[in-house]
Amino acid sequence: MRKVILLFLLFLSVDTVRTQGQNITFSHLTTDDGLSQFSVNSMYIDEQGIIWIGTREGLNRYNGNDIKSFKLKKNDPNSLFSNTVLRITGNRNGKVYLLCTDGVAEFDLATQRFKTLLQGNVDAIYFNEKLYIGKREEVFVYNESTGNFDLFYLSLIHISEPT
């Protein structure tokens, strides 16, 4: 319910969404418009000005006219591997990164295909020149040349209960 209220307040405070690639204007989007699910977890605007919306029922792409939904398709390695999209970010160079309940995925704007980068519990994703993920008290950075996540930071702080 909290996310619905936040989404409502967001739409009240923003009359239009302006992007670098194109001007997209809307007052609200619903499942009647094609949104896969009403509860929105995350939004991201890519370098082409497309709005990406993450929900509990998949990823949605809004181009100003139409919504296209991407969902898990069994036995299709190029589809989204988990329907619950928690966070979205991108590299402004053709890649959109997704934090899902089951790991991290990459969507290639050129090929329109998904690639699973990491399966398992991930707490956060962030992009700043490189893709970073947070797992418990560790931060990993994605190495595109190897396809691996390398340890970037390990918390050595341990606070114990007073005795």
Language-model-detected regions and their locations in the chain:
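Carboxylate-rich, polar loop motifs that coordinate divalent cations or form catalytic acidic clusters
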Residues: 1-160
